[in-house]
Amino acid sequence: MATPSMMPQWAYMHIAGQDASEYLSPGLVQFARATDTYFSMGNKFRNPTVAPTHDVTTDRSQRLMLRFVPVDREDNTYSYKVRYTLAVGDNRVLDMASTFFDIRGVLDRGPSFKPYSGTAYNSLAPKGAPNTCQWKDSDSKMHTFGVAAMPGVTGKKIEADGLPIGIDSTSGTDTVIYADKTFQPEPQVGNASWVDANGTEEKYGGRALKDTTKMKPCYGSFAKPTNKEGGQANLKDSETAATTPNYDIDLAFFDNKNIAANYDPDIVMYTENVDLQTPDTHIVYKPGTEDTSSESNLGQQAMPNRPNYIGFRDNFIGLMYYNSTGNMGVLAGQASQLNAVVDLQDRNTELSYQLLLDSLGDRTRYFSMWNQAVDSYDPDVRIIENHGVEDELPNYCFPLNGVGFTDTYQGVKVKTDAVAGTSGTQWDKDDTTVSTANEIHGGNPFAMEINIQANLWRSFLYSNVALYLPDSYKYTPSNVTLPENKNTYDYMNGRVVPPSLVDTYVNIGARWSLDAMDNVNPFNHHRNAGLRYRSMLLGNGRYVPFHIQVPQKFFAVKNLLLLPGSYTYVWNFRKDVNMVLQSSLGNDLRVDGATISFTSINLYATFFPMAHNTASTLEAMLRNDTNDQSFNDYLSAANMLYPIPANATNIPISIPSRNWAAFRGWSFTRLKTKETPSLGSGFDPYFVYSGSIPYLDGTFYLNHTFKKVSIMFDSSVSWPGNDRLLSPNEFEIKRTVDGEGYNVAQCNMTKDWFLVQMLANYNIGYQGFYIPEGYKDRMYSFFRNFQPMSRQVVDEVNYTDYKAVTLPYQHNNSGFVGYLAPTMRQGEPYPANYPYPLIGTTAVKSVTQKKFLCDRTMWRIPFSSNFMSMGALTDLGQNLLYANSAHALDMTFEVDPMDEPTLLSLVFEVFDVVRVHQPHRGVIEAVYLRTPFSAGNATT
């Protein structure tokens, strides 16, 4: 047997252990050897000892992972704070990169959580069909409407006991069995076939809701069962627990209206009160203001509640405090009490981590352990490629018997004793061999046509685009009352939009995004696949006992090798549901009843599985200050937010004089104020939103709203020089009117800006344009997200017959769709009056519109710190002017106006590094260097 010391050195950093042959049964070893040529066992049966192979003195060193329990915890209203003592023993090195917080708690996603589209209850019912029900008229007379589906026993009458459903012959005499009113007749049972050819009159029974149960459409209706057979009737109030259940059920009998005497009921309805609920639907058409049962309320129409996925954010963004005053965290040696975590307001910890992951791997591959499922959107929703529908063939639906309505015929035959001299064949009744009741339909089978393709496309547009239009395009249905707070789920859910705003004929043939949708966050959508995945990881119920693992992201801590000593490690975890959780609708989860509580937060950590003498050698090396650990923040940037008031178009920015050495350039984008929390406070009471947070997770979508940016230093040097298409010191991003032909890619982006972006992201441009290599073209990069588009619209000026017909007066599909509402169709078939034809021989005069979208990325302007060499190029070259002097900076951004306050997020790409020194046991020191903003703030 091989001794452990004979194992090769590489086994130190691997799962080491005995060879399988040393501890498996001889028979299995023999089998493995015999089959090794075509079925290699490899290390499938390796001894699961995880440890160094020699010089091991304690079993503690052999453990792959250790659990640290907090020595102190503070559970406050808005946060949960944990304090650990990390004891790193001699000859060990703790790998902070392997640590994670193991968190258990309870999550209530609130009543606004709905993890599916449509309804789970009677989803096949027409939206406006009522349940079988009763109501009283103004004379207090009871009316009943609906279906009695269950046939009684043939030949047996309805008696006072109800509907006969069977005959018991076991005792020798036939005894009629009547329906058990507690659950029979069952709503799911009726005629098993369409065939009814025996000619006998059958009696029917059914169930109906009493008038005291308020009417709701069948679509979405649910009533809980009250007995194990599935009956749903409520118990009468007088019912006591000791007696047999007394259900609120009464029988109502009905006979044909034409009968005037000798009444004999044909129908019996078992009327009952039930606990009627609509868990996932709401009313969009309500004829009156009352909820009580009435004839008019038969016509109510339901719509499913909007889907609202709720889960933890990508990579648990927002759960741990970063970038916030006094709440950041502590990693301090107990000997020195110097905190290695320095608080800087304008760090980009979360965003930096997102971009780092993108550079390391494919973000479209989900990793459930760290909750890595990146926010995404369906590109077919953001930009609609409306190429019409392929509906060349008509689609029919047929009655169940394939015929339709029939007439009853009797048989006739040629008359044998025909009267002589009569022209034509004479006929006689044939009732000897032919039935007197023959059901025959003359002509083609009855059919109805439905354009399935067009309906699917129209439904897609309404569910995915129209319902996400800004609230100003929506209205509240008549007789429906919604909450005042527009951030609540009930308000967002109750608002409806005219389907004709986004119909199959809008922009038909074009690849175009609705202008109104361009500034709407496309990641706040039920087709956000990453959020949907993260929501479903937690399950499909409102209440979740969760158990999650959360890594540390702060760049100075996350990769640290912690040398022997005793350390204090403190961090805060948020309990603000709007920050910790993400919803696809972006509603205010605080108001809508979501809560989160933590029951335990433990820290799991790994020691490097090294032999003790190897670990001590590593420790000795790292104690030397020449081997200090240095970490660069991946983004290496100082982030500043500048407010842009509603409808403003110009934003001036001034940076005081400083030396711009080590400066790499600018990145910038635009954020909505509503979607950006105040990270400087532990709890932001004004953050009443739970959708994606571009500031933290990189879901930028307002880049297309920039027009120009000018950059001026306090010198006469033209920067970045006059060798570009446009004027120095100014970058024109898009131009609406392009007389010189400076635009590119069939959109309104300028060639100049396209060049700058290709150079900044891929160093492509001066050698000609080409598609960047795959490893450079990541999820957050420019080229992958650049979406140019164009369309033609009617030339309202030069087309003399143009009439500006507004939405209420436009008709298309009249008679086949609802009027300005997602309700029952109305109107008559008639020629459409909208839109004007842009093709064919009758095409009207048109103009071309162009635009682009570029989501997820940040605009970049690269910069060289010897920029002062970039003056006017002459025969003498470029003169060095102020190469190392300090300069003030003035920037002016020109943007499209938006009707809500926004923020300019300006990222100064700086040299951002931390150097961590651990000179003695239990001492940790950190120095943060940040140039040119060494103070950590771009305004100083």
UniProtKB/Swiss-Prot annotation:
Keywords attached to this entry: Acetylation, Capsid protein, Cytoplasmic inwards viral transport, Host nucleus, Host-virus interaction, Late protein, Microtubular inwards viral transport, Phosphoprotein, T=25 icosahedral capsid protein, Virion, Virus entry into host cell
InterPro entries listed in its UniProt record: Adenovirus_Pll_hexon_C, Adenovirus_Pll_hexon_N, Adenovirus_Pll_hexon_sub2, Adenovirus_Pll_hexon_sub3, ADV_hexon, VP_dsDNA_II
A GO BP annotation: microtubule-dependent intracellular transport of viral material towards nucleus
Database matches in Pfam families: Adeno_hexon, Adeno_hexon_C
N-acetylalanine: residues carrying this PTM: A2
Induction: Expressed in the late phase of the viral replicative cycle.
Annotated site residues (Involved in interaction with pre-protein VI) in this chain: G765
Gene3D superfamilies: Adenovirus Type 2 Hexon, domain 4, Hexon Major Viral Coat Protein, domain 2, Hexon Major Viral Coat Protein, domain 3
Protein name: Hexon protein
The organism of origin for this protein: Human adenovirus B serotype 16 (HAdV-16)
